[in-house]
């Protein structure tokens, strides 16, 4: 659905007769419930005025159809689906000025030359009140993509004659404390010039200050599912006036077993609302949630691909080694990548105890390091992240709690000391570097214990044009994968009567 064709396929299609094209289009419309499909190049958002006018004309005439691509500077292909998606009024933005939004709302965009692809495509739909699904890699500017429309939504509601004061209008749900705090930091800063207030609700810390903030009145609530549900049940957090809902990292929330909490929270919001969902992948569980809680014809924008793929700005180096040699190799790599101890290096491990052990080992060998994992108190985690972000301690050891969504600027190197449990987590880990168009390096240790994931890793490396070490292919390259026209090749077959994910915490788990 909305998947783009290769240039070779486009050439073949162009040779077919008009009659064949019409027949295929009719069948497609029937299968897609008359959804209009537009596939365009992300770089179109930054093209010249002439190209933008041409794009608008094509949209108005319906000339842009499924499978059409425009290659320009190696940009990513953007696929847009949904009823009315081809309307000229939804043409992607070429500049911030093209939005005609109030200066105070756009204040948060100062310093950026132009909207990122996800912002350029999302804003026209979101500002028009459409339900929206965004599939894009981390580091693509998603927070501002939904943040600016959220601010405009609050401004409109505050301007209504019957508007209540001090009640939440916008809800943003996030899977982890750190990501929730990061979103809150952005929205607090962005909302200040507009007089719009936000509060962040997350576990691992006292409820007192959060309750006080809610009682004093806020416009935007950002939170994790667990703490949100607790405060709702206490009668402290009332969401009945929330008419703009964002589910950020939706796939991660469901992976963590938060589906019951998400459903319970959504049921507390206004029945008439705008629902926005951002996700790095599009698995069946997320699709099902969208079907239940969104408009029957939401807009869906896919930046790049729905399939599992790594950031092409990251050079991936995979080293197959014995488990016992990881400590010495880590030290050797730090001598190579972090000798001056000034550039930011992020080392990922799998378990909380492992994070503490590696941190201690490196400190004993003279390295200044901090760590972030679930056993640390929230204020210690926040302090460690701050030291790393500001560069006071540019070497951090972290569990996967830091692999999703966190925007840590200028991370030059990611080292996977322990390979993650899934290839998806691998992609998100290495996505901490190579952000915002910069280049990065990801060096990964792969051991005999990880051999079951070798085939998937080989596919990720090949898709990104990276070197595949012969030692990795010896583990096998076969991947059992079921194709689906709806979900693509990254599709997991789930039986209809299969039990839903539940949140299970192990002794050394790092889920919050």
Curated annotation (Swiss-Prot):
Residues 14-45 form a coiled coil. Residues 123-300 form the Helicase ATP-binding domain. ATP binds at residues 136-143. Its main location: nucleus. The keyword Coiled coil applies. Transmembrane segments: none annotated. One of its GO terms (biological process) is rRNA processing. It is found in: Nucleus, Nucleolus. InterPro entries: DEAD/DEAH_box_helicase_dom, Helicase_ATP-bd, Helicase_C-like, P-loop_NTPase, RNA-helicase_DEAD-box_CS. It is an enzyme of class 3 (hydrolase). It comes from the Eukaryota. GO terms for molecular function: ATP binding; ATP hydrolysis activity; mRNA binding; RNA helicase activity. Keywords: ATP-binding, Coiled coil, Helicase, Hydrolase, Nucleotide-binding, Nucleus, Ribosome biogenesis, RNA-binding, rRNA processing. It catalyses: ATP + H2O = ADP + phosphate + H(+). Its EC number is 3.6.4.13. GO terms for cellular component: nucleolus. Pfam families: DEAD, Helicase_C. The keyword ATP-binding applies. Belongs to the DEAD box helicase family. DDX5/DBP2 subfamily. The Q motif is unique to and characteristic of the DEAD box family of RNA helicases and controls ATP binding and hydrolysis. ATP-dependent RNA helicase required for 60S ribosomal subunit synthesis. Involved in efficient pre-rRNA processing, predominantly at site A3, which is necessary for the normal formation of 25S and 5.8S rRNAs. This is DEAD-box ATP-dependent RNA helicase 5. It comes from Oryza sativa subsp. japonica.
